[in-house]
Amino acid sequence: MEPRFKLWVEKDGLLVFSDYRAMLLDHIAKAGSISGGAERMGLSYRRAWGKVKEIERNLGVRLVRSEVGGPGGGQTRLTPEGEELLARYRAFRAAAESDVRRDFTEVFGRSR
């Protein structure tokens, strides 16, 4: 047996961040565009953009900055706040997962 859990962060009762949203920001950062990040997740551009805007609205910070293109096209990057949010969430998730595994082992014993 192995423990599984879902983790998300709320502010004033509103969902602001989760594994799904972290994955979206990560894909946007790696692709250099919202459309590329959306494609990697199998989402429409509109849905991905809506998720980013929802997070920004609920947190009150800007997470991505888009630059209009030149010869190579435009680019979207995470803002410093976006990078920090992603890094902190990953650290929080890793700590939570470690605690869940430890507690699971204490309660259920070693996995067979």
Sequence positions of predicted segments:
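Short, Lys/Arg-enriched N-terminal segment that forms or immediately precedes the first helix
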Residues: 1-13
